[in-house]
Amino acid sequence: MANYDYLCTILNYKITISINKTNHMTHYISAEHLSIERVGEIIEKGIKLALSDDAKARIQRCRKYLDEQIAASDVPVYGVTTGFGSLCNVKVSKDQLSQLQINLMMSHACGVGERVPNEIVRIMLLLKIQSLSYGYSGSKLDTVERLIDFFNEGVIPVVYRQGSLGASGDLVPLAHMSLPLVGLGEVEYEGKVMPAAELLKLKGWEPIELASKEGLALLNGTQNMSSFAVWSLLQAERLSDWADKIAAMSLDAYDGRIEPFTEAVHLVRPHKGQLETAAHMKELLTGSELIKQPKVHVQDPYSFRCVPQVHGTVKDTIRYVKSVIDTEINSATDNPTVCPDDDLIISAGNFHGEPIAMPMDFLAIALSELANISERRIYRLVSGTRGLPSFLVANPGLNSGFMITQYTAASVVSLNKSLAAPSSLDSIPSCQDQEDHVSMGANAAIKLYKVVLNTERVLAIELFNAAQALEFRFPKKSSPVVMKMHEDFRKEVPFIGDDVIMYPLIEKAIQFLRK
């Protein structure tokens, strides 16, 4: 009996470990809330996708309802038994409904410009699968499962950045994402770009036969904009945290004052992000010898003194934008909306990108400000004041030191200012004026992506400067947290004694922020 109990215990342990391992490596698509953090985890860790039983049932139920409605009625349903856009009054015969969907995908694949980065295309696939799984779109189960096959097998549809107006959904990029389902378009697989038909043959997959409405379900949606937004939010949270840490190092290197971060000051103007940033700065600088030494100056420049007010506003903006995008990625955003429970098929406007276009513009403005204030601190560090040598080099004149790092930061910051001009202010009517207001949210997404990368570059340049400046304060030391950050940075980027080629070191600083 004892041996039997022991064997059962071991078997149960092995089964538990196996289940836990499977669950850890597989994310089940369901109606449960999908967080932005979970999306990041799925992409970063290569977690596989599978449909939950409930999701399968919802997809099948919606498809069955739609088929029954088409069979039972001759009443035109937009995009299901009619043409698209301003052709909505042109009725299509039932024997041409599948071809209608393929024609839609082919004709709408008009993307130009650079490719959407692979990481963002993978987010796009995940978000499209999630949206279709709610059972309001009318997709067939095999269509959704093939999208999951693409995701799990590392098949990346080739999608181009430009072409979407961000209303009627992201028609152009989602057309490129969807073409490989039917053996058209291109994919990247194992680092090689190939025709989708070749990939299907390689995998032994048959092209999907689209049913009525499926092309619309795939193309009408905000998943291109949303995927850029999710990626940008994940980076924005990382950069916001780094901005505080780097500002703390810059402040100590500049012989700045700690008093502006006193809690009492911020309690009388209690914006959440401001309070958080002030507390974070105090925490980062706790134990610093430099911060405790007597100060000659009464005040610091705004770029140091107002870190809580500026960085804090960025935090609050990130928080707001995150709440909007969180709702968006847990929504069905195509048209028409099929509601089996309510016995309704309604042509409406859930594809319109305005709810996320404005927040993406807002986030681009916020991150641009994070870069703006960072560049101002860089300027202070290289200006030869408060006991620091001009351009942070021991022998200025013979050496130019960090002079041009500030030029680079200023150039990038200036570019950000133009990129942060809101795209959502613009609207150009299309489709014979049937689509007479559009969000331009896809343009907001593209610009936000660039602003994120530019802001990262400026913060990396500030860290490069701050680490150099801090060493001119030795043997006095900053706080344990700042000194550990400095120590880790020095493993990647050395102190600069005499002039060297700087751009590889800036790139190393950028990579350091990504670790």
Where are the language model's segments positioned?
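FAD-binding core of FAD-dependent oxidoreductases
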Residues: Y78-V92, Q96-L100, S107-L132, Y160-V182, ...
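Cysteine-centered functional microenvironments
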Residues: V159-S164, D341-I345
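Conserved, non-catalytic sequence blocks in retroelement Pol enzymes and Pol-derived host proteins
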Residues: Y136, L165-A167, G397
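Glycine-rich, flexible loop motifs
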Residues: T26-D74, L104-P157, L251, H266
